[in-house]
Each structure stands twice: as C-alpha cells, then as structure tokens.
Amino acid sequence: MALLPRALSSGGRPSWRRAARASRGFPLPLPFPAAATHALSRAMACRQEPQPQGPPPSAGAVVSYDYLVIGGGSGGLASARRAAELGARAAVVESHKLGGTCVNVGCVPKKVMWNTAVHSEFLHDHGDYGFSSCEGKFNWRVIKEKRDTYVSRLNTIYQNNLTKAHIEIIHGHAVFTSDTKPTIEVSGRKYTAPHILIATGGMPSSPHESQIPGASLGITSDGFFELEELPSRSVIVGAGYIAVEIAGILSALGSKTSLMIRHDKVLRSFDSMISTNCTEELENAGVEVLKFSQVKEVKKTSSGLEVSLVTAVPGRLPVMTTISDVDCLLWAIGRDPNSKGLSLNKLGIKTDDKGHIIVDEFQNTNVKGIYAVGDVCGKALLTPVAIAAGRKLAHRLFENKEDSKLDYNNIPTVVFSHPPIGTVGLTEDEAIHKYGKENVKIYSTSFTPMYHAVTKRKTKCVMKMVCAYEEEKVVGIHMQGLGCDEMLQGFAVAVKMGATKADFDNTVAIHPTSSEELVPLR
C-alpha cells in the first residue's frame, strides 16, 4: 500500500489532513500570503465557523462515512478524533453519555473519591504535625455534587471536541445488519463505512439469582457512584483492584467495611509482594478481610441487608456466618464485555466464551473492515491502552502506516489503594517462568516513608525490581507506598527503553524521597 504524500500546510509543515484530501481528489487551498492570512484571521474571529450542512438522508437511505465508531468511550473517541485529523469523515455512535466507563463510572469519579479518602487519612495525622482541632465532619453529599458536576463538565468537553472536529454524533444503540457490506442500524436508520470500529467497552459483572439468592439486592461499581449517603456498614465482594479501591475509600471515609475474598490475598494476579502487602495494609487500615469466604444468600430486612456467607479455610470444616444491618453490598467480581447487543452474528464476528471480541495484534477482527479496541476485547482493561490502540489504528487506516499497532508489553498500571500501588512489566513469577530461575535476579526493599516519621499512623513502602540475564535488564518494577502512583510513570519509561540495573545505579537519586530507594537497590 503506497504512503500518502507529505503535503505541506500553509506554514510549510507536513499536513496529513491535506495529503488525505489530495488522495481523495479534494482540491487543496493555496497558501495565503502572511498579510492576507492575518486579515482573514481577524475576519473569522468575528463570526463562528459554520458547521458543514447537507440534505438529510431519506428514511430508507444508507448514510456513508469513512469511519464509523461504535462507542463514545475513551478508545472510540480517541480513534475517531485522530481519524478526523487525518482527513477521514467520521461518526461516533453512543447510546449513553460520552466518555464511557472512565469518565462516568470509572477512573475519573473514582479518583475524586480516592482523593477524598486521602484527605480523611491525612486529617488523622494533622495533630502529629502540630495542628489542633483537626477533626473534620465529612459530608458525602457535598463531594458527590462536586464530583458529578465535574463529570458533567467533561461530558460537555467531549461533545464540544467532537463538534470542533466535525465528527457526527449518532445517538442510539447500534446493531449490525445482514446487508451485503458491513452496515449498522441505529434507531431505524442505516449507516455504513469501509472501516467500522467496535469500542463498546465493558460493564460490571454480578451473580445471578440462581447462583446466589438475593444477589440483585447488591450493587456494582456503577451503583457506587449513585449512592446518596455514606453507608454505615459495607460489604465488598471481590479481590481485584476495583474491590480493593472501593473498600479502601469507604473505610477511610468512615464506613465499617468488610472485604470478602475467595482466597487469602487480594490482587493475586499482581506480584506476590504486592498481593501480600496490600492485604496487610487493608487490614491495618481497619478493613475486615474475610478470607476463603463466599456469599451464599442475601436477604432484605427492616434494618438493611442480611448477608450469609460460608468460610472454608483449607484443612478446616466450612463455617456459616451472617453479617446483619448491611447498608451497601457491592459486587466487584469482574467485568463483562458490552458485545451481546450488537448482533455480531449477522457478520460472523468471532468472540471468546465470555463475549470478548477476538482481534489480532492490529485490532482486526475476523471480518474485513471491522476492528475492535478497549475493554470489549478483554485485554489490558485500562483507559490509556484503549486510547493508544485506537489512535494507532487510525494512523494505520488513514495515514497508511501499515505497521502501526500498540505494543502491549510493559504497560504500567496503578491501583489507587491505601497506600497506592504502581507496577510495570513482569512479576517475579512471570520472569522466572519466562527466563528460568537461574537467569532472574530480584532486588527489593521495605521501609517507612519519611512522611510517617512523626505520625502515629504508619504505612509501609515496599519496592521490588525484577532483572533478567547477566546484563540485569530491568523487566519489572513493583511498589506500594505513598507517592508510588505518581512516581511509576518515569520508571515505566526506563523499563520500556530497556534500562539495566547498572543504568539505575548510575543515576543520582533525589533526596529525601521514597523514589530514591528504588535507584540504588541492593
């Protein structure tokens, strides 16, 4: 496939939008002289740029675009906007609010609540730092109102960004049709494009009533953001990062919180050091971690929910217990892909047993011209991953960068636990499995951050560096402690670039910080 010519903008810079227009036969405007350009700018400033208008399609007509994106979440929006920048006529189909899980019921409102919880923790330390009368009364409704206002503002920003990029927003639910060429139908109207991206994300899983009687009395992480008051008594079910984060937030803000897990540790897919330390920190912070436990039944009573559970510690007889007066039972047991309502079978688009759309390394499905990115694919369920994959795809499709694809190796991730976790690369066990135990060297440390030098409340900071072969290439970094969420990004760049232990040793550390402990590890 031939690359588009590097057409120049009026300022002499390469413009892929101009190149794309030229390749489609659109005339390119000639560069204006500087004086004329300034005059035009002044004139344009006095009026709003008109939006492109066209005759409305008839009811039976099929509307065509260069790029159709199903899903207005982070990945879909990023891909659509990048495609538009490259000259494509794009449209986004969204049945709910723009921004997807991340903006509406995920990363963004979660981080606001985590920040709130951190304030609560620091309040307890103010006396140790010499401040008196530091006991503050928390009002859940105040932060909920401010949080929701912030989210609404982001929804508007996304809407404005699409409008400025001349990307059409199609409101409604998309389903594929049986037409000869890939086509979707939204609210009775059909749309088609040579390139269609599925970026519909995922949704929280919850058990069926047939599995756990009364399960529907609980909520999911989506429902967490609808709570009007801080629950007095909370039970969180799950051992993944969502369960850990919500349990930590509720506990820090004053809710009596139990975290029910099937095994003896949380975050079992993380490095063993992180899994062990995070479990301990939860317990130290006052979260009741119910290990080897599962919910058996949920009942509604006059004083709240009654949660019956069974605890089956290996080597012991199972024990049945009940937690009464529960205000909030929250299921955080995983996420399912939003793929069932798309009629994928009409085109024969393949999915796995859970409904995740199967794609190759270039985000292609098994059907030509149909692609998928983000949580609906079930791989690395992180907002920045969906954004990066969506943009890479746009460059491949509309800039003819045939090798443009996301490298899924060494993706950094953070858990907003208390204290936060940062991790990138292979765990110790993964490295041993990949390189052999004799070829793996581990460096680790554990210490109390300087912040806690004068506080009664203590949290640890633990760090681990995983290195491979004689050159000791750093293939993994894992840490939990104050500030680890912010310090990870720089270390992730080093890991991505292939840094060695010697590179870290040769770097002068910043003192006094927690991050300096990772540089000269022994």
Curated annotation (Swiss-Prot):
Please cite one Gene Ontology biological process associated with this protein.
cell redox homeostasis
Q: What class of enzyme is it?
A: oxidoreductase
GO terms for CC? Answer: cytosol; mitochondrion
Q: Which InterPro entries match?
A: FAD/NAD-bd_sf, FAD/NAD-binding_dom, FAD/NAD-linked_Rdtase_dimer_sf, Glutathione_Rdtase_euk/bac, GSHR/TRXR-like, Pyr_nuc-diS_OxRdtase, Pyr_nucl-diS_OxRdtase_dimer, Pyr_OxRdtase_I_AS
Which residues does the annotated transit peptide occupy?
Answer: 1-43
One GO MF term on file is: glutathione-disulfide reductase (NADPH) activity
**Pfam families, per this entry?**
Pyr_redox_2 (PF07992), Pyr_redox_dim (PF02852)
Q: What is this protein called?
A: Glutathione reductase, mitochondrial
Q: Where does glutathione bind?
A: 74, 81, 158, 391
Q: Which residues make up the binding site for NADP(+)?
A: 239, 242, 245, 262, 268, 334, 381, 414
Q: Which gene encodes it?
A: GSR
Disulfide feature:
102-107
- Oligomeric state and partners? Homodimer; disulfide-linked.
Its Enzyme Commission number?
1.8.1.7
